[in-house]
Amino acid sequence: MTDSKYFTTTKKGEIFELKAELNSDKKEKKKEAVKKVIASMTVGKDVSALFPDVVNCMQTDNLELKKLVYLYLMNYAKSQPDMAIMAVNTFVKDCEDPNPLIRALAVRTMGCIRVDKITEYLCEPLRKCLKDEDPYVRKTAAVCVAKLHDINAQLVEDQGFLDTLKDLISDSNPMVVANRVAALSEIAESHPSSNLLDLKAQSINKLLTALNECTEWAQIFILDCLGNYMPKDDREAQSICERVTPRLSHANSAVVLSAVKVLMKFMEMLSKDLDYYATLLKKLAPPLVTLLSAEPEPQYVPLRNINLIVQKRPEILKHEMKVFFVKYNDPIYVKLEKLDIMIRLASQANIAQVLAELKEYATEVDVDFVRKAVRAIGRCAIKVEQSAERCVSTLLDLIQTKVNYVVQEAIVVIKDIFRKYPNKYESVIATLCENLDSLDEPEARAAMIWIVGEYAERIDNADELLESFLDGFHDESTQVQLQLLTAIVKLFLKKPTETQELVQQVLSLATQDSDNPDLRDRGYIYWRLLSTDPVAAKEVVLAEKPLISEETDLIEPTLLDELICYIGTLASVYHKPPNAFVEGGRGVVHKSLPPRTASSESTESPEAAPAGAPASDQPDVIPAQGDLLGDLLNLDLGPPVSGPPLAASSVQMGAVDLLGGGLDSLMGDEPEGIGDSNFGAPPASVAAAAPARLGAPVSSGLSDLFDLTSGVGTLSGSYVAPKAVWLPAMKAKGLEISGTFTRQVGSISMDLQLTNKALQVMTDFAIQFNRNSFGLAPAAPLQVHAPLSPNQTVEISLPLNTVGSVMKMEPLNNLQVAVKNNIDVFYFSTLYPLHVLFVEDGKMDRQMFLATWKDIPNENEAQFQIRDCPLNTEAASSKLQSSNIFTVAKRTVEGQDMLYQSLKLTNGIWVLAELRIQPGNPSFTLSLKCRAPEVSQHDIQAYETILKN
């Protein structure tokens, strides 16, 4: 009979009977009793009263019985810690049993019993098991170290288990090596600063050897570990890729994705001119396609990962479009993901095929899917210019179907096509106007109103069409009301004599009859513009619109690089970095792809420009989503856009609505979402000019870098500027805020001094930052633990992170801040020193330095004289290193000391420097090279500040 009989009993009050059976002299009866206890425990009955009786059954040679008792112990030890001590002697004895299965079982169970009192007894048995002659015991003990570290990290370090664990890299058994990697990875994840996975070339060879011989899950641990390694050059990267490539044909999809992750990372270091690079691209496609033959649920994970891969390297799957065509029985989440990938892969070569598919999808019965398909046609028109006419024709065919939701979605996307290709397809406006009465969705109505307002001079009855919307003005959504207001103002500016009454009517409705502050504010702005300077109003309202982006939802490049490093994990499914959804200390390590070598630099993937900055001199681009129309005071009404960030407003605060997206969180009872909200400051398209070159670049003589000796400085802490008054009391109703920025041990802080110069007590403090160039945001709420009495001063260190919303500011290091207390909300702006963003891993390899310096165009080089600096070479190098500006190499030429230095910003931008120091001369010559020239001027200021203080 099977063991299912133990779960079918309906007896009550059997604890006493079980107790008697557990103390029976007959082994079989004991085993039966323990099975009954485990069955009761499994279905939720409390059998903890039997703890001492079950523990007595541990003294047995029967492996099955011992496993059952250990299972019981793991479940009840936490609730009965004092009783669990009874089992320690048996554990210690079992760890020396001749049977390796029992030794491993004992050490595994001891690791699973999370009771502090037992951990100290675990140390000696664990030490022996780590050096056991049997590999099964060693591999079990390796995992036990990670479990023990989770319970008591200090004990593990004091007992030297981490060193023993590291030594297992040389173990002859691949499973032991794999478990060693898994354990160290687990520990390193919870302690990012421990540097446990300090991999070297020799260790990598051992891991690659073990990779071929261990189980599939062990292979995943090893591949993930390989992904954390940084090869010293492209040759080593290619060697690793060659040995990892066979994993692509593995039957386990997790192994395949882990292998893809490693290859995607190391491809960054390979030259595109290599034959091997092209071969690797071809090898990556088939395994990814194979993953899509699974059931819908396991198919969704590869699809989400492929979405990332095609954003980074579309060439991998450019010939596999048909694989992503939707099947009739695909669930909606698979359909939508495939649709998104199809658009990303759309090109002039396959657009006809894609459009035919999308048109077919638009006739299906699933409303959500049909909407997405129609929107996809519009995205194709914007992405592939040659297909725009065909896309518009397809959309008109769909409008002729008169299916309401199809018509409405088509009008929304045609609005975007008009933005992308002005004065090209306006002939279809008449057809759109025929469907005006059938529009009942806010987005479609707003789109139609925008079209009528934008092309009012071409529509004879534009005033009648817009007037028809005014009848139910107060019943419309905010989106439609705002759009109608702007459209009628546009109409008035184009036909002033005929529409004066209409514009007065809408301004009156917006400013006098509306409770919506956004609508009211926009109405007043238009009213003042029109009444004071109609010419200026025309220039503002009818200004030429910026281009909309070809890709509205591409992930920001630095985030994409980070997500590529998390392929095969939950982060790649969420499309969010781990720190965005993992609480506590785990998952906070920021990963990024290695910097591309000079030979591998891609024209279509330039090295990260500063957050929010265009890579070249292109017109400002804004996303085509929601109601983003380029008009004055455009507000965030839809979901956040993940396209290119908007240009920032200037430092002058003026009437900026700083908290246009975050006021709710600041004014509520609790300051939730601190540092997260999207601010709604109106963008002004201000392009940052590259700093002027101050002289011809000095010949750097970098070809001899390989023979140079590194300059080594002493870490003495980053320079901290003295506190300055950021918000005077007279501007903040008695609240004075002074502060400075610091960076210590990899953490950025805003050190604040709050002084109450008012006559009333201040409480309920909260702080919020506007979107800024580097994503600076509070990492925790502003904690003022006691009310701030009159004339009292409090010092606070506010931790910051760089995972906030990004928007390019002018100047680049401008930070706009809102502070709220029980009196009011106050705004100020300050400039943070760029050196607080210099990260600790900013020392570039010499070969990489040489290749990158040569690869960065000469026009990106900025040169500057630092005067009145009395430091010698060693002191200067040491001082700069304390602020994370690292000396890669040093040489002396014609009596001049030349320091070659590198630094890296938090968003992954590298800056290379050549500092020339003439002994006895207080003037230094600094040459900087960076792929983002606008960063250089601020780096020069950082150099000068650090060296002179």
From Swiss-Prot:
Modified residues annotated as 3'-nitrotyrosine in this record: 574
Listed SUPFAM superfamilies: ARM repeat, Clathrin adaptor appendage domain, Subdomain of clathrin and coatomer appendage domain
Topological relation to the membrane, as annotated: Peripheral membrane protein
Keywords linked to the UniProt accession: Acetylation, Cytoplasmic vesicle, Golgi apparatus, Membrane, Nitration, Protein transport, Transport
PTM characteristics: The N-terminus is blocked.
Function text: Subunit of clathrin-associated adaptor protein complex 1 that plays a role in protein sorting in the late-Golgi/trans-Golgi network (TGN) and/or endosomes. The AP complexes mediate both the recruitment of clathrin to membranes and the recognition of sorting signals within the cytosolic tails of transmembrane cargo molecules.
Gene name of this polypeptide: Ap1b1
Sites bearing N6-acetyllysine, chain numbering: 318
Coiled-coil zones: none
Residue stretches of biased makeup (Low complexity): 594-616
Complex formation: Adaptor protein complex 1 (AP-1) is a heterotetramer composed of two large adaptins (gamma-type subunit AP1G1 and beta-type subunit AP1B1), a medium adaptin (mu-type subunit AP1M1 or AP1M2) and a small adaptin (sigma-type subunit AP1S1 or AP1S2 or AP1S3).
The organism's place on the tree of life at top rank: Eukaryota
An example Gene Ontology biological process: clathrin coat assembly
Protein name: AP-1 complex subunit beta-1
Region: Disordered, residue numbers: 592-623
Cysteine pairs bridged by disulfides in the record: none
Subcellular location: Golgi apparatus; Cytoplasmic vesicle, Clathrin-coated vesicle membrane
Similarity comment: family membership: Belongs to the adaptor complexes large subunit family.
An example Gene Ontology molecular-function term: protein serine/threonine kinase binding
Gene Ontology CC entries for this record: clathrin adaptor complex; clathrin coat; clathrin-coated vesicle membrane; Golgi apparatus; synaptic vesicle
